[in-house]
Regions:
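An N-terminally biased module of ancient metal coordination in phosphate/nucleic-acid-related enzymes
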Residues: 2-69, 75-183
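A metal-dependent hydrolase metal-coordination microenvironment
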Residues: 107-273, 277-284
Length: 287
């Protein structure tokens, strides 16, 4: 859910190292939200509990502030530990806005937080809108990256990427697909792979627009198509040579390994998608 407070005010920096004195700026986004006169800034550490119920934790620090000449409010505070902190702006005893900032330990403090979706369908499988429209809707709602991962199909992710290839926006559209192969009920997401795993075998479900390598890969480079019989032969060979626990379906297990191996070879990330069931009832036993 998008914070409506951020349509009227911006606060920055939003992420910074913990246990260090940090200056934070609050900027009104328009004349309707302008600061006038004197305010109180209340800072509370989220993990320390309600200040009224746990007063011994001293989880309420207050600052009296007035806007600078540019209309922004600035104050300096030491944010303890790795956690979220509430920043409340109070005027005449009433809260004007509550904003959040985040203090982090060194391992995360130098990184950027990004918002994205690793698995999304379009009308090319069981979604409702075209890939380009789905991508636009995600960007409109503040997402930084998106992988379109339609059932059996890799080319819809390329369709979205090509739709915006000449648009100068900081938006990372990633290749992807939802892989489900014959003899295996387990669906696996191929996130960011350079080529399609589904399209390693023939089938109308992913070749309805053609079977060229430009539709099966991001750079025109991918393995040749093999027959279903060859796929099963390779999976059965894996099943004989893997250390598969008793009670586990050997072909299913080996097929998953085969899929993950290809995703890794394609420099992608393999993600188990709903590994135990779908369609409102359980289909796959626990591995």
């Amino acid at each position: 859910m998008i914070k409506l407070e951020l349509t009227n005010y911006d606060i920055f920096p939003k992420v910074f190292p913990c246990d260090k004195e940090t200056e934070v700026t609050i900027k009104p986004l328009g004349a309707h939200a302008a600061f006038e006169g004197e305010y109180t800034v209340n800072v509370r550490a989220f993990n320390e509990g309600n200040a009224a119920r746990y007063p011994e934790r001293n989880n309420l620090v207050q600052y009296s502030v007035t806007p600078d000449t540019d209309g922004h409010i600035r104050f300096t505070h030491t944010y303890i530990d790795e956690q979220e902190h509430y920043v409340d702006i109070i005027k005449d005893g009433k809260r004007v806005v509550r904003l959040s900032v985040y203090s982090l330990l060194p391992d995360l403090a130098g990184r950027y937080p990004f918002r994205g979706d690793l698995h999304m369908h379009t009308c090319r499988s069981d979604g409702n809108q075209a890939p380009a429209i789905v991508a636009a809707e995600y960007r409109k709602n503040g997402y930084d990256f998106l992988a379109i991962t339609d059932h059996d199909s890799y080319y819809p992710s390329l369709e979205a990427i090509n739709a915006y290839k000449d648009v100068p926006i900081e938006y990372n559209l990633v290749t992807g697909e939802e892989v489900h192969l014959e003899g295996n009920d387990i669906h696996i997401v191929n996130f960011g792979g350079k080529y399609s795993v589904n399209a390693l075998m023939p089938g109308d479900h992913h070749m309805d627009v053609g079977d060229g390598k430009d539709l099966r890969s991001i750079d025109g480079e991918c393995p040749d198509v093999i027959s279903v019989e060859e796929y099963k032969k390779q999976v059965n060979y894996l099943a004989k040579n893997l250390n598969i626990p008793d009670g586990i379906e050997k072909f299913t297990y080996a097929s998953c390994v085969w899929i993950f191996n290809h995703i890794k070879k394609a420099d992608g990330l393999g993600i188990l998608h709903i590994p135990t069931g779908f369609r409102m009832f359980f289909m796959c036993p626990k591995a």
